[in-house]
């Protein structure tokens, strides 16, 4: 399965445009083929470009968050010619790469923090993926503690300002580098970066501000989804911290193999067996489709391996269930290994009419000649 675009850039799903740009510049500078000659660097650079191209476009990003790569299949990848070292930031970017976390960086935010996103893998039957519907799942996620309202403090008390960092959440330390001495900001070891200390912890959540809850959810499956399609359920991830919004739940879909049907894009593939007489004379037979039984016309003289098409009986397009692919049916012709005496006589008469000599190949050779053998 393809890597997640957010993972490729090393950013969270809530990253804003500026965060995406910084991450992209840093990685693109590192793996640009003019700079990095290591094996695999060029492919890595293409992967980074593709991820940034999608995530930097608000509409493409929304489609990707909803449907994964299936939702952005039409977004083209940029080539190397569009990107040069000159476009990737100046000395400040290089400085940040080597000295991230020093005073040139912004101060750590101590306000509301968005909750973590969660992942759930959901298995679907073949027809469920074709037609969509609703599925009920159960998840475990963190919810804001109702006793302390997320503060982590015992009711009637409040967190107090951390005396180590003065509520900033960071402490300073000096460091010497080849470029001189710098002051580095690091996370406060006392409060863990929150800027506050809880003296009387909430008994319900143990001072965490959230508790784990098991919850049932109904997931709407769009028609036409495929293996690896990702659905986003807004607000069903873990609870945020300090009044921050919850994360999202990402449901990854995995379609189970079907004993009768296969999928190729939006087309459905299957095979049928017919007798040699049906192939010679033609007929109409009933075949299985995802919609139920359907009538299929077998033209006279149908050859083994012929592919017949039932139009509009395939997989719906995601987001446009009215538009469907086709059902492609491959015909296998069965040649009997045993026939009755009467059948043999009739076939031998037919062979004489056609001027066929039944030599070494016998009757089987004659039947093979009828089907292009």
UniProtKB/Swiss-Prot annotation:
CXXCXGXG motif repeats lie at residues 145-152, 162-169, 188-195, 202-209. InterPro entries: DnaJ, DnaJ_C, DnaJ_domain, DnaJ_domain_CS, HSP40/DnaJ_pept-bd, HSP_DnaJ_Cys-rich_dom, HSP_DnaJ_Cys-rich_dom_sf, J_dom_sf. The keyword Chaperone applies. Residues 4-68 form the J domain. Pfam families: DnaJ (PF00226), DnaJ_C (PF01556), DnaJ_CXXCXGXG (PF00684). Keywords: Chaperone, Cytoplasm, DNA replication, Metal-binding, Repeat, Stress response, Zinc, Zinc-finger. It comes from the Bacteria. The J domain is necessary and sufficient to stimulate DnaK ATPase activity. Zinc center 1 plays an important role in the autonomous, DnaK-independent chaperone activity of DnaJ. Zinc center 2 is essential for interaction with DnaK and for DnaJ activity. Homodimer. This is Chaperone protein DnaJ. It comes from Thermosynechococcus vestitus (strain NIES-2133 / IAM M-273 / BP-1). The gene is dnaJ.
């Amino acid at each position: 399965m393809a890597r997640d675009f957010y993972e490729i850039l090393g950013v969270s799903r809530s990253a804003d445009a500026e965060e995406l740009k910084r991450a992209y510049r840093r990685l693109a500078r590192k793996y640009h083929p003019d700079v990095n000659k290591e094996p695999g660097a060029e492919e890595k650079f293409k992967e980074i470009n593709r991820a940034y191209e999608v995530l930097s476009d608000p509409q493409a990003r929304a489609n990707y968050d909803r449907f994964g790569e299936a939702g952005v299949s039409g977004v083209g990848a940029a080539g190397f010619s569009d990107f040069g070292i000159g476009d990737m930031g100046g000395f400040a970017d290089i400085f940040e790469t080597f000295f991230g976390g020093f005073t040139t960086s912004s101060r750590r935010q101590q306000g509301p923090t968005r909750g973590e996103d969660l992942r759930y893998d959901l298995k679907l039957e073949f027809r469920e993926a074709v037609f969509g519907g609703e599925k009920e799942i159960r998840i475990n996620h963190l919810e804001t503690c109702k006793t302390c309202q997320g503060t982590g403090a015992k009711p009637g008390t409040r967190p107090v300002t951390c005396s180590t960092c003065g509520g900033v959440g960071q402490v300073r330390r000096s460091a010497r580098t080849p470029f001189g001495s710098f002051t580095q900001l690091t996370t406060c070891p006392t409060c863990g970066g929150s800027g506050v200390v809880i003296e009387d912890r909430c008994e319900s959540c143990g001072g965490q501000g959230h508790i784990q809850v098991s919850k049932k959810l109904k997931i709407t499956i769009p028609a036409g989804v495929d293996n690896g399609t990702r659905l986003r359920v807004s607000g069903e991830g873990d609870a945020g911290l300090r009044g921050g919004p919850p994360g999202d739940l990402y449901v990854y879909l995995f379609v189970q193999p079907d004993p009768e049907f296969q999928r190729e894009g939006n087309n459905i593939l299957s095979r049928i067996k017919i007798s040699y007489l049906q192939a010679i004379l033609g007929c109409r037979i009933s075949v299985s489709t995802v919609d139920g039984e359907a009538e299929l016309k077998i033209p006279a003289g149908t050859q083994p391996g012929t592919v017949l098409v039932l139009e509009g009986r395939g997989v719906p397009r995601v987001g446009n269930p009215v538009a469907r692919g086709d059902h492609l049916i491959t015909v296998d012709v069965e040649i009997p290994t045993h026939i009755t005496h009467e059948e043999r006589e009739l076939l031998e008469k037919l062979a004489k009419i056609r001027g066929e000599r039944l030599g070494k190949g016998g009757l089987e050779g004659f039947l093979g000649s009828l089907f292009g053998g």
